[in-house]
C-alpha cells in the first residue's frame, strides 16, 4: 500500500494513519505489509473521540521489574534472606555450637528461592517487552480510566465473595478435623476418653478456623489489591497462545504453561475468560485470566476469538 494512503480498518471501517500497525479505534491489527510502528515507543496518536484507542508513548507502558505486580515480594524475600544470615554471623561471633549452622542452611534456602524468583521475574518481563513490540499481537487496547475503575471494583467484589464462600466452609472443615483428631487421641483411653477428646478437638478446630480465616482473607485482599494497585489504566495485548494483561505475561508452550480454555462471557459486564495452567512454583501460576472487554472492543474480540483459541490444549 502506498505510504500516502490511509488504511481502512476491516472490522470497524474507520480510517487510520498510514503508519499505524493497529487500528486506533478498535485495536485490530492491520496487514503486516503496512509500514511498521513501535506502538509503545511512538508518539501519542490523539484520538478524536474518548472511546477510541490512544497509543501512548509513555515509557511507563512498557513492562519493567519495578511495575510488575510481584515486585513487592522482593523486599520480603530479601528480608527473610538477610535475617538468618545475621543470626549465623551473630552465632559465630559468640562461639555458639550448633544453631548458627542451621541458620546458615536457612539463609542458603531463602537465597536460592530469591534468586529463582528474580530469574523468573526478569524472564517474564523480558518476554513481555519482546512480545509487545513484535508483530505477533492480533489485538490490543487500553482501558479508559472509567473502565479500569469498573474492572478494579468488579475484581475486589468477586474476590470478597470467593473469600466469604471459603470462610463458610473453612470453619466447619477445621472443626471436623479437630473432632476426628480428638476422637483418635482420646480413644487411647477407651470410649470414656474419646467423647471428651472429640469435644475438645472440635472446639480447638473451630477456634483455629476462626483465627485462620481472617488471616487468609487479609492476605487474599492484600494480594488482589497489589495486582490492581496502579491507578493507571493498563494494556491488554492478545495473540494466539500469548497474553499480556495487567503487567503480567503468559505464553503457552510445550514445557509446562498451557491454555486450557478461552471463552467470552457476556452479561451485564462482558469478560474474556482465559483458563491457564502453570507448574507450581512458576511465576505464571497466579496469572489472572479474567479480562473485562469494553463494549467498544466487543466486536473486535469476537472476530479474533477463533484465532486466540488455536493454542488451547488438545485443539492445536
UniProtKB/Swiss-Prot annotation:
Gene Ontology cellular-component annotations: plasma membrane
Subcellular location: Cell membrane
Record Pfam families: DUF6861
Key words of the record: Cell membrane, Membrane, Transmembrane, Transmembrane helix
Principal cellular location given in the protein's record: membrane
InterPro entries: Tre1-like_N
TM stretches of this protein: 74-94, 99-119, 166-186, 188-208
N-terminal signal peptide: none
Bilayer topology annotation: Multi-pass membrane protein
UniProt protein name: Uncharacterized protein slr0273
Organism: Synechocystis sp. (strain ATCC 27184 / PCC 6803 / Kazusa)
Amino acid at each position: 500500500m502506498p505510504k500516502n494512503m490511509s488504511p481502512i480498518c476491516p472490522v470497524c471501517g474507520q480510517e487510520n494513519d498510514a503508519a499505524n500497525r493497529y487500528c486506533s479505534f478498535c485495536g485490530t491489527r492491520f496487514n503486516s505489509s503496512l509500514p511498521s510502528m513501535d506502538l509503545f515507543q511512538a508518539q501519542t496518536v490523539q484520538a478524536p473521540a474518548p472511546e477510541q484507542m490512544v497509543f501512548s508513548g509513555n515509557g511507563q507502558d512498557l513492562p519493567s521489574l519495578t511495575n510488575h505486580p510481584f515486585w513487592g515480594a522482593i523486599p520480603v524475600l530479601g528480608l527473610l534472606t538477610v535475617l538468618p544470615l545475621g543470626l549465623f554471623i551473630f552465632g559465630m561471633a559468640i562461639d555458639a555450637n550448633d544453631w548458627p549452622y542451621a541458620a546458615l542452611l536457612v539463609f542458603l534456602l531463602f537465597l536460592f528461592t530469591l534468586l529463582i524468583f528474580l530469574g523468573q521475574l526478569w524472564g517474564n518481563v523480558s518476554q513481555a517487552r519482546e512480545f509487545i513490540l513484535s508483530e505477533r499481537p492480533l489485538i490490543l487496547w487500553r482501558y479508559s480510566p472509567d473502565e479500569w475503575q469498573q474492572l478494579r471494583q468488579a475484581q475486589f467484589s468477586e474476590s470478597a465473595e470467593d473469600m466469604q464462600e471459603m470462610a463458610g466452609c473453612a470453619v466447619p472443615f477445621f472443626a471436623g478435623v479437630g473432632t476426628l483428631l480428638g476422637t483418635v487421641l482420646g480413644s487411647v483411653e477407651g470410649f470414656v476418653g474419646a467423647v471428651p477428646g472429640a469435644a475438645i478437638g472440635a472446639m480447638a478446630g473451630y477456634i483455629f478456623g476462626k483465627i485462620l480465616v481472617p488471616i487468609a482473607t487479609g492476605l487474599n485482599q492484600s494480594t488482589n489489591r497489589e495486582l490492581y494497585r496502579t491507578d493507571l489504566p493498563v494494556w491488554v495485548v492478545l495473540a494466539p497462545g500469548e497474553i499480556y494483561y495487567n503487567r503480567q505475561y503468559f505464553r503457552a508452550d510445550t514445557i509446562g504453561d498451557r491454555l486450557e480454555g478461552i471463552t467470552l462471557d457476556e452479561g451485564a459486564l462482558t469478560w474474556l475468560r482465559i483458563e491457564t495452567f502453570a507448574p507450581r512454583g512458576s511465576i505464571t501460576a497466579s496469572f489472572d485470566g479474567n479480562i473485562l472487554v469494553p463494549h467498544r472492543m466487543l466486536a473486535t474480540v469476537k472476530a479474533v476469538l477463533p484465532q486466540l483459541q488455536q493454542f488451547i490444549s488438545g485443539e492445536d
